[in-house]
């Protein structure tokens, strides 16, 4: 279902959810730079439809998937919940705007929320055919014995957080973190080149590399200090990057064998 569709309200009315976990979004930075109007339509107008439908259905709380992209290129690392938000892409802008709407709906309309500002989430079942999710894209390419593309110089860093850890953060937010916006990461920054080298070691295949320019909207570095999430949500990332990479690679390997 398109979250912008007016029929969303009828669904909420039928099922009467107590809590809404809102992950539906236009999530590609690249698409947001090519079509900012579409990005805003889904991520802002769609959110407002979800919030209005929630109010009418008597929803108690919304747990919202925000993004570390709201911070852009910070002056200092690691990024904390109090780091100034200066997004470098329309995607990051719409996620920041969404947080402001959530605050409004809490203070003026009585709808509670918790927003989770994710690092780079990865893991099994991630789409390897899109423009986002370098680990899934690399893993699938390695298994097909194809080359990979590395944008920029490959030394740009991200805080890669495993999907199971992120799922736990969402469960924690069901009853905790009222009105809070929390960065969700491991506290470790890893370059794209390092991800490539780790997958070479896991797969035993050195994929040919093609270099490309920086993509519009991409930030240079990201590293998140989730101390506030530890205190308020009682959450901590527990999966080592190497373990998550291995599990993700094995998942795509199983798909390749089954296919």
What are these regions (language model features)?
Residues 1-121:
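N-terminal Rossmann-like NAD(P)+-binding domain of SDR-like oxidoreductases, especially those catalyzing
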Residues 97, 101, 105, 138, ...:
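Hydrophobic alpha-helix immediately C-terminal to the catalytic Tyr-X-X-X-Lys motif of short-chain
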Residues 36, 128-129:
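Active-site loop immediately N-terminal to the catalytic Tyr-X3-Lys motif
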Residues 140-259:
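C-terminal substrate-binding subdomain of Rossmann-fold SDR/epimerase-dehydratase oxidoreductases
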Residues 86, 128, 159-162:
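Residues at the N-terminus of a long alpha-helix
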Residues 31-32, 73-75, 125, 160, ...:
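Short glycine-/acidic-enriched loop or helix-start segments at secondary-structure transitions
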């Amino acid at each position: 279902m398109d979250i912008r569709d007016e029929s969303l309200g009828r669904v909420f009315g039928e099922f009467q959810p107590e809590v809404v976990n809102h992950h539906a979004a236009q999530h590609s930075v690249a698409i947001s730079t090519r079509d900012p109007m579409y990005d805003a339509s889904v991520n802002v107008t769609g959110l407002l439809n979800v919030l209005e439908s929630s109010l009418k259905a008597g929803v108690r709380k919304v747990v919202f998937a925000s993004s570390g992209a709201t911070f852009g290129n910070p002056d200092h690392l690691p990024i904390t919940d109090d780091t100034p938000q200066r997004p470098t892409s329309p995607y990051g802008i719409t996620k920041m705007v969404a947080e402001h709407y959530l605050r409004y709906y809490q203070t003026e309309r009585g709808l509670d929320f918790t927003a989770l500002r994710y690092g780079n989430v990865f893991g099994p079942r991630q789409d390897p055919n899109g423009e986002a999710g370098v680990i899934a894209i690399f893993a699938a390419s390695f298994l097909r014995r194809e080359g990979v593309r590395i944008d920029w110089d490959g030394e740009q860093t991200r805080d890669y957080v495993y999907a199971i850890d992120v799922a736990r953060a969402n469960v924690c937010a069901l009853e905790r973190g009222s009105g809070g916006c929390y960065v969700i990461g491991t506290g470790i920054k890893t370059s794209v080149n390092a991800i490539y080298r780790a997958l070479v070691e896991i797969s035993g295949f050195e994929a040919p590399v093609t270099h490309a320019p920086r993509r519009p909207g991409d930030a240079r570095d990201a590293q998140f200090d989730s101390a506030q999430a530890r205190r308020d949500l009682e959450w901590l990332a527990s999966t080592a990057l190497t373990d998550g990479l291995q599990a993700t690679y094995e998942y795509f390997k199983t798909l390749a064998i089954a296919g």
